[in-house]
């Protein structure tokens, strides 16, 4: 019997359709599809169109990636191009390594 997969809930805060925003979204989608196929929900929030959401979530810079679930909440601000840094920053690589240890 295989264990249930966790669902990851993420928010990506961007400022408009700038090259940085487009690159961050493209890179993040590639990482998520490779690592978490079908077990994630990603909401993209444009802080220029929805400044109240950025204020509520205390977003000070873009792009910012926030992992909401599973707890604890983690945020990465800035460049998302390094896959390993993104996974470590969100506490996802550690979980992945831990699960591999038990599946030997």
From Swiss-Prot:
User: What are the entry keywords?
Assistant: Biological rhythms
Q: Which GO terms describe its biological process?
A: circadian rhythm
UniProt cross-references to InterPro entries, sorted A to Z: Circ_KaiB, KaiB-like, KaiB_domain, Thioredoxin-like_sf
Q: Give the domain of life.
A: Bacteria
Q: Where are the transmembrane segments?
A: none
Is the Ribonucleoprotein keyword given for this protein?
Answer: no
The answer to whether the entry has keyword Transmembrane is no
| A Pfam family that the UniProt record links to this protein | KaiB
Q: How does it assemble?
A: The KaiABC complex composition changes during the circadian cycle to control KaiC phosphorylation. Complexes KaiC(6), KaiA(2-4):KaiC(6), KaiB(6):KaiC(6) and KaiC(6):KaiB(6):KaiA(12) are among the most important forms, many form cooperatively. Undergoes a major conformational rearrangment; in the free state forms homotetramers as a dimer of dimers. When bound to the CI domain of KaiC switches to a monomeric thioredoxin-fold (KaiB(fs)). KaiB(fs) binds CikA, leading it to dephosphorylate phospho-RpaA.
- Physiological role: Key component of the KaiABC oscillator complex, which constitutes the main circadian regulator in cyanobacteria. Complex composition changes during the circadian cycle to control KaiC phosphorylation. KaiA stimulates KaiC autophosphorylation, while KaiB sequesters KaiA, leading to KaiC autodephosphorylation. Phospho-Ser-431 KaiC accumulation triggers binding of KaiB to form the KaiB(6):KaiC(6) complex, leading to changes in output regulators CikA and SasA. KaiB switches to a thioredoxin-like fold (KaiB(fs)) when bound to KaiC. A metamorphic protein which reversibly switches between an inactive tetrameric fold and a rare, thioredoxin-like monomeric fold (KaiB(fs)). KaiB(fs) binds phospho-KaiC, KaiA and CikA. KaiA and CikA compete for binding to KaiB(fs), and KaiB(fs) and SasA compete for binding to KaiC, thus the clock oscillator and output signal pathway are tightly coupled.
Domain comment, in the record's words? Has 2 forms, fold switches to a thioredoxin-like fold (KaiB(fs)) when bound to KaiC.
Which PANTHER family does the entry link to? CIRCADIAN CLOCK PROTEIN KAIB2, KAIB-LIKE PROTEIN 1
- Which family would the database say this protein is a member of? Belongs to the KaiB family.
Would you tell me the protein name for this molecule? Circadian clock oscillator protein KaiB
The organism named in the record is Trichodesmium erythraeum (strain IMS101)
What is the name of the gene encoding this protein?
Answer: kaiB
